[in-house]
């Protein structure tokens, strides 16, 4: 990769900052010659790999990973009318094999319900087959007609983790929804990204679902980014695809289902929430490199310093850290710039003075310096990284809290959504939602709010004055 030495735009100019950091920090290359399709740089893919490693570890507790085909026959795809209505304008169709027109067109999956559920109907026979919890990490395709943006709005979603579960009763499926919500909370806690959970309005739920719970974070420009969804499907799809089981009494019953997904928007959230004017700031849990060692070479002690740095690298690698010794023939300042841009959580400096004092200097990506005893360096670095991670969590929570405003009038709501999320009272009607949205140029994104940063209450609807409860209003990506 060509070395970047330019200045990153200030993060307060978020759109420009975001576009620049994707290539300066080597996350994604946007120059692929198809709109809405992008290429992961190795460094960006390393972040994705570690983040999805966390996600897979969480999923593997009680889900099994699988893989379904990319192509879906039109005959299966068109079976669930409400579901198809939500996706029909976004589907890519394969109509030819070579020069031959296909008898049945094939859809490139926009999501996999219509690929997976016909197979579930074959696999599930008895109540002893339930619950069934499977997931896959795949690419999906949607013909986005809106402005595409790397990691945020794509025509090829390269990292779609979708889970599909089947249960004997509605109550068990509803309990699985709560389990999925808890899992997503744990995932984003690990990424140090604060989220607000809420129930999407009926007109904005997943097509074919009874209801949808979504996880949103607030971006630096005040817009919300949906970074996870959990859908209660009820028995809609099981009736369409004949997913039945024999209960303990020998009777045939329709199953109940859930599905839930996360995409590379999770990486966009990490980039946007934690990054600063110097570049990426990566939580240790998702950083491809946790520690970079920079030798400070002065005078005639070059070989001694490099040997000491190499010994430190070997010790840290042996202790399980993702570590790299940067022994390139460059000024230390140029190395600092390089690794700060890429978000490495911790830089360790080793120079002649440190060797003489039997110490090393650890510099967190936040700029905080700590002198560590060389003899206890593994424990010291473990402690510094843990503190760094907690600092990221607290800073992200404080930034989110500052972007949440309670509003009692449409005027206050309009002002609040310019820089963040407004919490208003809403009666739940679509008519009032449309009035609010037209007045403030933002959307009702959810009610039944779950966040310790928001005090939920009842009060008069901001649009009609009738009985209402807390709801979120925001500009969205």
Swiss-Prot record:
SMART domains: ProRS-C_1 (SM00946). It catalyses: tRNA(Pro) + L-proline + ATP = L-prolyl-tRNA(Pro) + AMP + diphosphate. Belongs to the class-II aminoacyl-tRNA synthetase family. ProS type 3 subfamily. Pfam families: HGTP_anticodon, ProRS-C_1, tRNA-synt_2b. Its EC number is 6.1.1.15. InterPro entries: aa-tRNA-synt_IIb, aa-tRNA-synth_II, aa-tRNA-synth_II/BPL/LPL, Anticodon-bd, Anticodon-bd_dom_sf, Pro-tRNA-ligase_IIa, Pro-tRNA-ligase_IIa_arc-type, Pro-tRNA_ligase_II_C. Homodimer. This is Proline--tRNA ligase. The gene is proS.
């Amino acid at each position: 990769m060509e070395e970047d030495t330019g200045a990153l735009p200030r993060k307060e100019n978020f759109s420009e900052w975001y576009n620049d950091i994707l290539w300066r920090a080597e996350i994604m290359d946007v120059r692929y010659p198809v709109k809405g399709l992008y290429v992961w740089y190795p460094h960006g893919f390393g972040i994705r790999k570690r983040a999805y490693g966390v996600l897979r570890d969480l999923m593997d507790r009680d889900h099994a990973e699988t893989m379904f085909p990319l192509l879906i026959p039109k005959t299966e795809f068109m079976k669930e009318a409400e579901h198809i209505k939500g996706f029909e304008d976004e589907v890519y169709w394969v109509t030819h094999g070579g020069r031959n027109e296909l008898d049945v067109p094939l859809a490139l999956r926009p999501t996999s319900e219509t690929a997976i559920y016909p197979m579930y109907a074959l696999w599930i026979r008895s109540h002893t087959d339930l619950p069934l919890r499977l997931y896959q990490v795949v690419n999906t395709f949607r013909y986005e007609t809106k402005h595409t943006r790397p990691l945020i709005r794509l025509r090829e979603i390269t990292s779609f983790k979708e889970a599909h579960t089947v249960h004997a009763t509605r109550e068990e499926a509803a309990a699985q929804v709560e389990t999925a919500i808890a899992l997503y909370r744990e995932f984003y806690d690990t990424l140090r990204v604060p989220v607000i959970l809420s129930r999407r309005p009926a007109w904005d739920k997943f097509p074919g679902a009874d209801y949808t719970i979504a996880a949103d974070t607030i971006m630096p420009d005040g817009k919300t980014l949906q970074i996870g969804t959990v859908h209660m499907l009820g028995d809609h799809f099981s009736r369409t695809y004949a997913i039945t089981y024999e209960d303990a009494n020998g009777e045939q019953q329709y199953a109940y289902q859930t599905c839930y997904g996360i995409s590379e928007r999770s990486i966009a959230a990490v980039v946007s929430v934690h990054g600063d004017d110097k570049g990426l700031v990566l939580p240790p849990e998702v950083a491809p490199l946790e520690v970079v060692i920079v030798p400070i070479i002065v005078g005639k002690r070059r070989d001694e310093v490099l040997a000491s740095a190499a010994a430190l690298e070997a010790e840290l690698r042996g202790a399980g850290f993702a570590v790299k010794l940067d022994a390139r023939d460059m000024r230390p300042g140029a190395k600092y710039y390089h690794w700060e841009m890429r978000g490495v959580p911790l830089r360790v400096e080793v120079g002649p003075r440190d060797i003489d004092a039997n110490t090393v200097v650890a510099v967190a990506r936040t700029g905080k310096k700590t002198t560590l005893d060389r003899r206890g360096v593994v424990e010291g670095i473990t402690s510094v990284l843990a503190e760094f991670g907690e600092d990221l969590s607290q800073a992200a929570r404080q930034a989110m809290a500052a972007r949440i405003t309670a509003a009692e009038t449409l005027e206050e709501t309009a002002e609040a959504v310019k820089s963040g999320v407004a919490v208003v009272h809403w009666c739940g009607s679509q008519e009032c939602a449309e009035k609010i949205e037209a007045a403030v140029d933002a959307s009702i994104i959810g009610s039944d709010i779950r966040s310790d940063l928001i005090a939920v209450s009842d009060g008069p609807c901001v649009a009609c004055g009738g009985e209402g409860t807390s709801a979120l209003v925001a500009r969205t990506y």
